[in-house]
UniProtKB/Swiss-Prot annotation:
Transferase listed as a keyword: yes
EC numbers: 2.3.1.-, 2.4.2.-, 2.3.1.286
Gene Ontology biological-process annotations: cellular response to hypoxia; DNA damage response; glutamine metabolic process; mitochondrion organization; negative regulation of cardiac muscle cell apoptotic process; negative regulation of fatty acid oxidation; negative regulation of insulin secretion; negative regulation of protein processing involved in protein targeting to mitochondrion
Catalyzed reaction equations: N(6)-[(R)-lipoyl]-L-lysyl-[protein] + NAD(+) + H2O = 2''-O-lipoyl-ADP-D-ribose + nicotinamide + L-lysyl-[protein]; N(6)-biotinyl-L-lysyl-[protein] + NAD(+) + H2O = 2''-O-biotinyl-ADP-D-ribose + nicotinamide + L-lysyl-[protein]; N(6)-acetyl-L-lysyl-[protein] + NAD(+) + H2O = 2''-O-acetyl-ADP-D-ribose + nicotinamide + L-lysyl-[protein]; L-cysteinyl-[protein] + NAD(+) = S-(ADP-D-ribosyl)-L-cysteinyl-[protein] + nicotinamide + H(+)
Keywords tagged on the record: DNA damage, Glycosyltransferase, Metal-binding, Mitochondrion, NAD, Nucleotidyltransferase, Transferase, Transit peptide, Tumor suppressor, Zinc
GO cellular component: a single term: mitochondrion
Record protein name field: NAD-dependent protein lipoamidase sirtuin-4, mitochondrial
Cofactor note text: Binds 1 zinc ion per subunit.
Entries under SUPFAM superfamilies matching the protein: DHS-like NAD/FAD-binding domain (SSF52467)
Name of the gene this protein is made from: SIRT4
Protein purpose: Acts as a NAD-dependent protein lipoamidase, biotinylase, deacetylase and ADP-ribosyl transferase. Catalyzes more efficiently removal of lipoyl- and biotinyl- than acetyl-lysine modifications. Inhibits the pyruvate dehydrogenase complex (PDH) activity via the enzymatic hydrolysis of the lipoamide cofactor from the E2 component, DLAT, in a phosphorylation-independent manner. Catalyzes the transfer of ADP-ribosyl groups onto target proteins, including mitochondrial GLUD1, inhibiting GLUD1 enzyme activity.
UniProt lineage: Eukaryota, Metazoa, Chordata, Craniata, Vertebrata
HAMAP family attached to this UniProt entry: Sirtuin_ClassII
Length: 314
């Protein structure tokens, strides 16, 4: 089943107009959460025991924790981006080399940003933030770029793939808040308008080539260089210093909990291998199979926002 939504942006009027035939509402959040079996009380007890025994718990989250906030993931059966469309995420090399590709990316990102940036943490994000405040969570590593952990108050946090809230200059490294860049887009494109369909996990939406052609893209205010979101695009690599930092946190931990990730991407999977080699107990909470199910002592197929708030971190 194909599922989508539509928003119309009118830059001259400075507002979004929801398509009444497919409104974006709280009901749409469930569109991106794959089906899962009812909670198994025995599995809940097993996870509770796992958390109770953990003294230096490291948690790694993926896109599955944010689907309940209305942000789709890529790989979930029937509801992920790959299942709903033949579109694929932008490649790092293409973005760096091609001005038309950068123009298309930023036009789509400009249209999608107001909705993407408005998403809020769900009970799973708040639960992990509470665990940190109570001293249960030693470190949190997220593969997501949506800033929802930060919005929930998490501070002992590594954003493995960066964050869409920030923009970097590819030439001089100048960092700009994404909201500030949105204002520059509006100044450069006062009469530009487009209708967007479908939201991607990185805030991208889908526009036609004709819609994109007239869109003006700002450059770095410091050096005139090209701007890029402070995220790791597909085909790029995570900063080695960040990788080393996370490896150290894993080695300092006494247990690892994976939340909402299939671990198909090696950038996150490698830390599971490190934990396994260190003989740390590994628990996985994810709807559907993961790359590391055979390494885990506990696997739960449940919604993150339904299960995590049931766990007592004390």
């Amino acid at each position: 089943m194909k599922m989508s939504f539509a928003l119309t942006f009118r830059s001259a009027k400075g507002r979004w107009i929801a398509n009444p035939s497919q409104p974006c509402s709280k009901a749409s959040i469930g569109l991106f959460v794959p089906a899962s079996p009812p909670l198994d009380p025995e599995k809940v007890k097993e996870l509770q025991r796992f958390i109770t025994l953990s003294k230096r718990l490291l948690v790694m989250t993926g896109a599955g924790i944010s689907t309940e906030s209305g942000i789709p993931d890529y790989r979930s059966e029937k509801v992920g981006l790959y299942a709903r469309t033949d579109r694929r995420p932008i490649q790092h090399g293409d973005f760096v080399r091609s001005a038309p590709i950068r123009q298309r990316y930023w036009a789509r990102n400009f249209v999608g940003w107001p909705q993407f940036s408005s998403h809020q943490p769900n009970p799973a994000h708040w639960a992990l933030s509470t665990w940190e405040k109570l001293g249960k969570l030693y470190w949190l590593v997220t593969q997501n770029v949506d800033a929802l952990h930060t919005k929930a108050g998490s501070r002992r946090l590594t954003e493995l793939h960066g964050c869409m809230d920030r923009v970097l200059c590819l030439d001089c490294g100048e960092q700009t808040p994404r909201g500030v860049l949105q204002e520059r887009f509006q100044v450069l494109n006062p009469t530009w308008s487009a209708e967007a369909h479908g939201l991607a996990p990185d805030g991208d939406v889908f526009l036609s080539e004709e819609q994109v052609r007239s869109f003006q893209v700002p450059t770095c205010v410091q050096c005139g260089g090209h701007l890029k979101p402070d995220v790791v695009f597909f085909g790029d690599t995570v900063n080695p210093d960040k990788v080393d930092f996370v490896h150290k946190r894993v080695k300092e931990a006494d247990s690892l909990l994976v939340v909402g990730s299939s671990l198909q991407v090696y950038s996150g999977y490698r830390f599971i291998l490190t934990a396994w080699e260190k003989k740390l107990p590994i628990a996985i909470l994810n709807i559907g199979p993961t790359r590391s199910d055979d390494l885990a002592c506990l696997k739960l197929n449940s919604r993150c926002g339904e299960l995590l708030p049931l766990i007592d971190p004390c």
